[in-house]
Amino acid sequence: MYHVVAATINPAKIKAISQAFSDIFGAGSCHIEGVEVDSGVAAQPISNTETRTGARQRVMNARRVRPEADFWVAIEAGIEEDTAFAWMVVENQKLRGESRSASFTLPAIVMKGIHQGRELGDEMARLTGIDNIKHKGGAIGAFTAGHLTRSSVYHQALILALCPFHNDIYQRKADDEDSDLI
C-alpha cells in the first residue's frame, strides 16, 4: 500500500487526491495522510508563477515532514488577473508530475474583495453565506450550481499530474530509438 502525503488538511483537496490515486493505482492501494505545511507564498497567490511555486514548496515541505512516504502531493489554488485555477504537484523519490486545473473567470464583485486583501474562499463565504466554503464545494461549486466542485476539478488535474508515474512513455529518453513505434 502506498503512503501518500497530502500537503494539506483541506477535506476537498484530500478527497480529490484520494479519488485520483484510487483511479490510477486501484481502490485501497493508498493511505492518504494530510499534513499542514507552508507554501512559502501569499495566502492568496495572485499569479500563475506564484501559485505553481506554492504547490512545489508545499511538496518540498511535506517531504521534510514525512520523508518516509511513497508520494507527496500538493494543490495550490491561485488567481491571475481575474481567472481562478490551481496547480497540482505530485512527487515520489524519482519523478515529478505537474498539471494545472481548469480555470474560470471570477466576477468583478469577487475580484473587488481579492483586491482588498481577502482570500477567494473568505470572499466567497462572505458573498454566499456558506461557512468555510473552501473546505466544501468552493467557488467552483457555488458558480456551477454544484455541477462541479473543487474536488471534481482538482481530481481531473491530479489524474494528469499522475501520468509520469504509470505511463512508460514518460520514462523514455528523448534520444531513444523510436522506430518500433511506427
From Swiss-Prot:
Binds 1 divalent metal cation per subunit; can use either Mg(2+) or Mn(2+). GO terms for molecular function: ITPase activity; metal ion binding; nucleotide binding; ribonucleoside triphosphate phosphatase activity. Mg(2+) binds at D38, E68. The keyword Repeat does not apply. GO terms for biological process: nucleotide metabolic process; thiamine metabolic process. Its cofactor is Mg(2+); Mn(2+). Gene3D superfamilies: 3.90.950.10. Belongs to the YjjX NTPase family. Homodimer. This is Inosine/xanthosine triphosphatase.
